[in-house]
Swiss-Prot record:
It comes from Homo sapiens. Belongs to the peptidase S1 family. Kallikrein subfamily. The gene is KLK11. This is Kallikrein-11. Glycans are attached at residues 131, 197, 213, 242. The active site is at 94 (charge relay system), 142 (charge relay system), 235 (charge relay system). It is linked to Ichthyosis with erythrokeratoderma: An autosomal dominant genodermatosis characterized by early-onset ichthyosiform erythroderma with excessive skin scaling and peeling, and erythematous hyperkeratotic plaques. Lesions are present at birth or appear soon after. The lineage of its organism: Eukaryota, Metazoa, Chordata, Craniata, Vertebrata. Residues 1-50 form the signal peptide. CDD domains: Tryp_SPc (cd00190).
């Protein structure tokens, strides 16, 4: 678990990749060596929870995903998220932090585009069934609501995505999006939002790919020949099918985009009642 947490905490900076540290922490050659060891161990395990990347996708048409949000901790991109109401975001529970800076309405994270909105958020509601003590071992109920301090203004560039209690079936074409790395195992972090078209696969094939790790609240998606996937770098982002939110990017295989090893998503249709009740009570 700890080694995967270290892998998740790597980030992008203007000079390349640096290891994220808690405020006040100091690095040392010994710590740097330990970080490298943990990363190599995490890669060796194969299964990776957390931050995802869009592999072999394409640059999204600017502002074509107006529900897409980016969760930052200060200047560090933590996860993706989906706007589902003026004050509410849906993301993965393993993205839990005490405070976020939320960026919406952006395509290029390094440019001011005139339509972006920024909010803070300190209230998070992970699903009560999520095992936060084992965030990279137990992937069940990997879903969380985040309440922003103030509502966003609904514009052409910032707009909520519809939820649906009707689950999609195998063969449905869907879209994933995020700002994570565009290659695996090497990390190449884009500035602009990336998209990929993928397809929902049969539940039995999903179980066969990850024996003992798949529940009925998870859904798998990929392309049959491999090559397109979500993986480390931007967890919590949306899986959009038929213009509704059907999945939250959760976990999968590393290296990513391997044939017969699809990405695994939290099946949002199974949680609509919990989402609505949590928003109503808070």
């Amino acid at each position: 678990m700890q080694r995967l947490r270290w892998l998740r905490d790597w980030k992008s900076s203007g000079r390349g990749l640096t290891a994220a540290k808690e405020p006040g922490a100091r690095s040392s050659p010994l710590q740097a060596m330990r970080i490298l060891q943990l990363i190599l161990l995490a890669l060796a395990t194969g299964l990776v929870g957390g931050e995802t990347r869009i592999i072999k996708g394409f640059e999204c048409k600017p502002h074509s995903q107006p529900w897409q949000a980016a969760l930052f901790e200060k200047t560090r991109l933590l996860c993706g998220a989906t706007l589902i109401a003026p004050r509410w975001l849906l993301t993965a529970a393993h993205c839990l932090k005490p405070r976020y800076i939320v960026h919406l309405g952006q395509h290029n994270l390094q440019k001011e585009e005139g339509c972006e909105q920024t909010r803070t958020a300190t209230e998070s509601f992970p699903h009560p069934g999520f095992n936060n003590s084992l965030p990279n071992k137990d992937h069940r109920n990997d879903i969380m609501l985040v309440k922003m301090a103030s509502p966003v203004s609904i514009t052409w560039a910032v707009r909520p995505l519809t939820l649906s209690s009707r689950c999609v079936t195998a063969g449905t074409s869907c879209l994933i999006s995020g700002w994570g790395s565009t290659s695996s195992p090497q990390l190449r972090l884009p500035h602009t939002l990336r998209c990929a078209n993928i397809t929902i696969i049969e539940h039995q094939k999903c179980e066969n790919a990850y024996p003992g790790n798949i529940t009925d609240t998870m859904v798998c998606a990929s392309v049959q020949e491999g090559g397109k996937d979500s993986c480390q770098g931007d967890s919590g982002g949306p899986l959009v099918c038929n213009q509704s939110l059907q999945g939250i990017i959760s976990w999968g295989q590393d290296p990513c985009a391997i044939t017969r090893k699809p990405g695994v998503y939290t099946k949002v249709c199974k949680y609509v009642d919990w989402i609505q009740e949590t928003m109503k009570n808070n």
